[in-house]
Amino acid sequence: MLKPTWLRVKAPQKERIGTINRLLTDLKLNTVCEEASCPNIGECFAGGTATFLIMGPGCTRACPYCDIDFDKSIRTVDHTEPTRIGEAVSRMRLKHVVITSVNRDDLADGGASHFVACIAAVRAASPTTTIEVLIPDFCGNLNSIDKVLAAKPEIINHNIETVPRIYNRVRPQGVYQRSLYLLDWIKSNDKNLYTKSGLMVGLGEIDAEVLEVMADLRAIQVDVVTIGQYLSPGSKHLPIDRFVTPTQFDNYKAIGELEMNFLQVVSTPLTRSSYHSGEFRNLMRDNPRQN
């Protein structure tokens, strides 16, 4: 299936990308931008932003849509990683940072303690940087979620990924209701925290199902939703079922913001979980909450 013209991306600024890549290489850090073959890597790196991928690069799950390497071996966590992330945030002068992880089902708490350490390291190295964490489902372990909550990042993101009807095919080790419950638990325990979720389209869902997922998310007071076109990483991954038009992405945004009252819906063909995440600071400013 040929990509339509609206999925073309601008050539990246090689000089800026090279600078960021050298820094990440020097500090031995991974980014989801590279590991997941994100189409926005040029734009984000050129703008001096990155989403750090911790506890990787191998993932203990093998979701058929994802380009991150599968690795079910038992691996220790690198306890120097949080300090290196803090240093990178400081050297890159990031105003907003996103920290995400692979699934680490081999760890007792799914890696929640490592998230906490990374949040603390960023706070120490760059106190004014706002922190967003994109967390796995921790196999539904609420104690793990509570650890991350206690560290008080500004925003917690957990992606719902797709619609219930095709969940088992797209995310075989995930559970739709479990992800909803996780997001509900987060908001129920800290109503001042901003919550976020995202999904892909083009996997076999229909537009009505996308809107139903958005309604489910808004019912549990999720604040921000991201919606983007699924792009198959290769022949061993799930195929693309359809290309959603820019007009329909605009419709998702309009319905989400004007009718469902999300604070923000980021909905474009190239949107990914952390796309334009730096704009979150403006969202906080315009919609302040108590600390």
UniProtKB/Swiss-Prot annotation:
Cofactor: [4Fe-4S] cluster
EC annotation from Swiss-Prot or TrEMBL: 2.8.1.8
Location(s), subcellular: Plastid, Organellar chromatophore
InterPro entries reported in the protein's UniProt record: Aldolase_TIM, Elp3/MiaA/NifB-like_rSAM, Lipoyl_synth, rSAM
CDD domains (UniProt xref): Radical_SAM
Key words of the record: 4Fe-4S, Iron, Iron-sulfur, Metal-binding, Organellar chromatophore, Plastid, S-adenosyl-L-methionine, Transferase
Main location: plastid
Cofactor note: Binds 2 [4Fe-4S] clusters per subunit. One cluster is coordinated with 3 cysteines and an exchangeable S-adenosyl-L-methionine.
The organism's place on the tree of life at top rank: Eukaryota
Residues that hold [4Fe-4S] cluster 2 according to the record: C59, C63, C66
Record-annotated Radical SAM core domain positions: 45-263
Cellular component, GO, one term: organellar chromatophore
Catalysed reactions, semicolon-separated: [[Fe-S] cluster scaffold protein carrying a second [4Fe-4S](2+) cluster] + N(6)-octanoyl-L-lysyl-[protein] + 2 oxidized [2Fe-2S]-[ferredoxin] + 2 S-adenosyl-L-methionine + 4 H(+) = [[Fe-S] cluster scaffold protein] + N(6)-[(R)-dihydrolipoyl]-L-lysyl-[protein] + 4 Fe(3+) + 2 hydrogen sulfide + 2 5'-deoxyadenosine + 2 L-methionine + 2 reduced [2Fe-2S]-[ferredoxin]
Name of this protein: Lipoyl synthase, organellar chromatophore
Species per Swiss-Prot/TrEMBL record: Paulinella chromatophora
Lineage, uppermost ranks: Eukaryota, Sar, Rhizaria, Cercozoa, Imbricatea
